[in-house]
Amino acid sequence: MIEKIMAIWSHLLPNKTFDLNANFFDCGGNSILLAYLQWHLEKSFFITLSAIEFFSYPTIAGMAELVALKRST
């Protein structure tokens, strides 16, 4: 799951190397890229996300946790 999220980040963000605890917005993310990220994650993992959730889980590790939570419900 983490590898897939990293691949999505690499596709969307200009900085191609990411730490698991790097913040999406600190790495060049913005509201438009956030919408694309949300779409990619929803399609890749068959879940529904709210854009507001990304502010609580702004890292790759956090997003993996969020996806796992969504998939378990």
Language model segments and positions:
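Phosphopantetheine-dependent thiolation modules in NRPS/PKS and related acyl-activating systems
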Residues: 1-73
